[in-house]
């Protein structure tokens, strides 16, 4: 981590079984907030139907409780995974009593780790997971009278199932209208999407190392590397497939085009012009 580093921890507690997860993060940015949610849901073995966050800026844009306006990025993430966000009310201890009690407990039983030097965040997380696992075997769930671990194992069937792939955490999200050239603009670059999305509105997310593009129905349309030197990112696969009653399939490339055009424009390899001339002669 490069010396002593101040970290934040996300503590997620299931209301029924009191099972919990502690996820360490380097910041409170939206990117890390969503990544921490992903890791917490994985450890809990599912997704709660309702999530009640405190009124932190990464979750709530303004207001609190039922009158809160959620951050659009967090709201979009919740819709994609299917859970409802129900922020805490101001000065209402009953709304977050369980997790605050768990937070005090976490500080106590993880106190021994503060004097240990961890070179990687992953090592600290592994040590934390180990202590959490031991803790839930000893603590008793007040609802069931059994251990938190045993109560959680019974509760898992009531949680929403984890998707095959959790959403890639993102720090920027915008809506864009696809041009007639099947391109969308984002961060000074243009990205190609499947031709059937022409003139439709899509959702573009800037993730840690990629740009993810989704349709309005949540369908994943395209993935590109983020922040490339290339300003026009084309993927020839997006011109394949059948058209529909709204859009016809683009005219396929000819022999020369198929031989010269790169499948992914950002993976351009520099070649002498003589190589292209020789290629054209062979195909002529």
Name each model-derived stretch:
Residues 4-18, 25-26, 52, 77, ...:
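Short conserved beta-strand segments at catalytic cores or DNA/RNA-binding microdomains
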Residues 67-85:
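Two-metal-ion acidic nuclease core segments, chiefly of the RNase H-like superfamily
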Residues 53-54, 64-65, 83-108, 120-124:
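RNase H-like two-metal-ion nuclease catalytic core shared by retroviral integrases
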Residues 1, 18, 51-54, 78, ...:
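Short, conserved catalytic/metal-binding motifs centered on acidic residues
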Residues 7, 22-50, 227-233:
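Active-site beta-loop-alpha junctions of metal-dependent nucleic acid enzymes
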């Amino acid at each position: 981590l490069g010396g002593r580093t101040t970290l934040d921890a996300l503590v997620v507690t299931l209301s029924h079984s009191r099972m919990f997860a502690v996820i360490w993060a380097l910041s409170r940015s939206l990117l890390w907030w969503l990544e921490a949610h992903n890791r917490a849901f994985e450890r809990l073995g599912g997704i709660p139907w309702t999530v009640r966050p405190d009124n932190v800026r990464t979750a709530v844009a303004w207001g609190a409780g039922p009158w809160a306006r959620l951050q659009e990025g967090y709201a979009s993430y919740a819709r994609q995974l299917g859970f409802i966000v129900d922020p805490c009310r101001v000065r209402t201890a009953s709304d977050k009593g369980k997790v605050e009690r768990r937070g005090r407990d976490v500080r106590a039983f993880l106190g021994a780790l503060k004097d240990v030097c961890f070179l990687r965040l992953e090592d600290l997380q592994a040590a934390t997971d180990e202590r959490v696992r031991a803790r839930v075997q000893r603590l008793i769930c007040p609802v069931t009278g059994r251990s938190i671990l045993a109560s959680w194992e019974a509760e898992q069937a009531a949680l929403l199932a984890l998707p095959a792939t959790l959403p890639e955490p993102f720090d920027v999200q915008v809506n864009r209208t696809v041009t007639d050239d099947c391109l969308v603009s984002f961060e000074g670059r243009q990205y190609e999407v499947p031709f059937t999305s022409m003139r439709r509105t899509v959702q573009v997310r800037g993730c840690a190392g990629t740009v993810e593009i989704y349709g309005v129905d949540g369908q994943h349309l395209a993935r590109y590397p983020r922040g490339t030197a290339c300003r026009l990112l084309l993927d020839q696969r997006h011109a394949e497939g059948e058209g529909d009653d709204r859009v016809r399939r683009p005219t396929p490339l000819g022999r020369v085009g198929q031989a010269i055009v790169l499948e992914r424009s950002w993976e351009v390899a520099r070649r002498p012009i003589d190589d292209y001339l020789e290629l054209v002669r062979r195909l002529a």
